[in-house]
Amino acid sequence: MTPEIITIQPARVPNAVRMPLWIRQNLGSDAHYGKTSDAVQANRLHTVCEEARCPNRGECWSRGTATFMLLGDTCTRACGFCSVKTGKPDHFDADEPRRVAEAVMALKLNYIVLTSVNRDDLADGGAGIFAATLRELRLRDATIGVEYLTPDFRQCQDDAVRIIMDALGELPDGARSDLVWGHNVETVPRLYQTARKGSKYQRSLDLLAKAAQQSGVEAKSALMLGLGESRAEVLAVLRDLYSAGVKRVSLGQYLRPSLNHLPVLDYIHPEVFTEYEHEARAMGFAWVKAGPLVRSSYYAEEQQGDTHA
């Protein structure tokens, strides 16, 4: 039976349901957790693990992996679900790519996820920093796996794709020339006006389609559930993503960062996530992760070596 479609409520309203046991998770305290934290702080960097209060931070950091957030810690948009601070960024750090690469080398990672805040104040949306970080990483380690999780590059998608693909094509002989390019649609189209102000569903699909068309690039996206979307809406988004050329997808539970953010309307049972995973695989997605604590970069390192040439 299709669940009732619920209209999302404004911030400060209590969650509609209590958090179930399957959601709760302790912060990791493995020795590698401290090593990852130290490397991030020593290089004056930001991770989405911290800024977005990811529930898997302890687990991932204890494995010695992290998702580095480029272009500072201030976003030019204000999505209703996100805890990253918003405002007018006060600087542009051209040295950030070098410091990210040095932190990655210090941690001896073989797969790195790079994301960023939205920087609508920049002509290229920040694409140049993504490209420069890719170069810095593969100049130091020609075999390192790199995954992007980019904004939608509003007003400059074509330029952003060109900048990034130029960097990929100019790497030294012997360096990997592949890339996973992720961009999250986050939610169903009906909820964009409330959950993703400043973003457009079709714009996100357009970027994913452009990324999927590039040689050596595999497109990836993610959905968070629990904002009142219906099963039919979720399946429709999965079909749209697959039609756009996306081959990798993840689905996870929305967890409210604070009372100033959108309330959780439903906690999706793990069995329902399993059903969505089966549906996505049946549609043809090559890689699927679905579960309450899954995030777009969760166990991303498992994917390395799978991108097409």
Role assignments for model-derived ranges:
Residues A66, L70, F81-A94, E147, ...:
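Active-site mouth loops of central-metabolism enzymes
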Residues K85, V117-R119, L149-R154, V185-V188, ...:
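Active-site beta-loop-alpha junctions enriched in small/polar residues
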Residues I112-A132, G228-E233:
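Conserved glycine-rich "GG(E/T)P / GGGxP" loop and the immediately following alpha-helix
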Residues N118-A123, P189-A195, P257-P263:
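A short acidic, helix-capping loop that chelates divalent metal ions and anchors anionic groups
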